[in-house]
Structure formats: C-alpha cells, structure tokens
Amino acid sequence: MTQFPSYASSFRLYKSVSEQYNDRSILDSVKRLVPEKVLQLIADDQNLKPLLHWFKNDFMKWMPKELQCKRCNNRPMSIQLVDANTGALRKTEIHVCNVCGSEQIFQRYDNILRIAETRVGRCSEWSILFGAITNSLPIQTRIVHDYLDHCWNESLINNKWVHIDSTLDYPISFDHPYYYEQNWGKNYEYVLAFSANSVEDVTTRYTQQWYLVQKRRGRKDKMKELREIYYRT
C-alpha cells in the first residue's frame, strides 16, 4: 500500500477543495462560466450530457504529461517539480528541452477560480473544477481518487452516487464505474471519496474483483487509520 504521508498530502488538497464546494461565492462564479443554453438543457432532469460535452470539448484543455518542445519539437522533455503548497499553487512543473534548453512551465492549482481562469490541467484540475460547476447547479458532487493515477467525481442523482468523469467521452463519462478496471487494468486497493467532513471507502463501487482487492489489502483494513489522518490534516 502507498505510504501514509502521500495520503496526507492529497487529503489536504481534497479537504480544501471540498470546503470550496461549500463557498457560495465560488459556486456562483463558476456557474456563470456555463453557457445559458447548457444550463437550460440540464435544468429539468439533471441530464449532465450537455455539461460534460461542453466542459470537455469547448472549455477545458488537456495538459499532457510529456510535452513537446515548442522551439525544436523535441520530445520528451525533462521535468523538474517544485512544491509550493502556498496559497492557491500546489506545485510547478518545469519542462526543460534536452536539445535546445527551452522551458515550458505548468502551474498546478488547488484554487477553483484559478483553475477556471487557466482552463488547463489533468484529471485533478478537471475533476476539481467540474465538481464545483455541478455543485453550483446545485447537484451535490464530490471528488474520488483511486490512489493509482486517476481521480474523478461522483454526483448524487436520484439519491444515488453516480460515477462522473469529465475527462472521458460520453457515454463512458457517465455512470461507468467499472470502466477503469475493465479497460485500464486498474488493480485497486483503496478508492476514496471526499467531502468537507469525511472520507469514504467506495472501492466496492468500482470493482468486480473484490476478492483481489481484499487480497491486496491484506488482513488489516486501514480505513480507520486513513480517517484519522484525514481528520488531523
């Protein structure tokens, strides 16, 4: 299992994000980003297809993990990580070309309004901002992390937590919880969902191989320890 210090770092992030999800001024600001025609389409039946399409295809831009040099087209570039953990900035990625030495900088934020301003990121930025937008509708939404390499959202629709992944194409982006295990070969140990006051083990929702998850976990369930870390963070 991943060592607990790495969990603590992500817990700080998701607790901050969950608190922002309860900030009315932030939610009002991100709701104004959504075109009125999209809002009208989802208003009556909580159909998120128009919102997912707009967010992925018209609003956000994906940041690849490996960048190509804009000067000489060399790929891949070397990456230097600079931790910030101050204010809205989490860390800075400095991508340096091994051929010509030019640099590209990608700053990673935990501040919802800053992400909305830059409109670029990977799964964490996408899920953080998309969750804020759905909460503004208001459709209660939270962050989910698999502690492998991906995170997404869950929205409470018809009294059921539904898998939502704004980085994927519809219909896979909506209510396809087994997609990652079936198509990406995910070997889960803990999949956690976050709110401002709690962390929940939702692994069973995303696996059809629970016996293998239990084998990876071993005899001791570590959720009690993880909750204690979350509340202390």
Name each model-derived stretch.
Residues K56, M60, T134-I139:
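Hydrophobic/aromatic-lined pockets within catalytic cores
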Residues M1-T118, R122-E125, H145, N158-T233:
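Alpha-helical and coiled-coil interaction segments, frequently adjacent to or embedded
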Residues N135-D149:
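Short, well-structured beta-strand/strand-turn elements
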Residues W152-I157:
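A short beta-strand motif that forms the metal-chelation/ATP-contact edge
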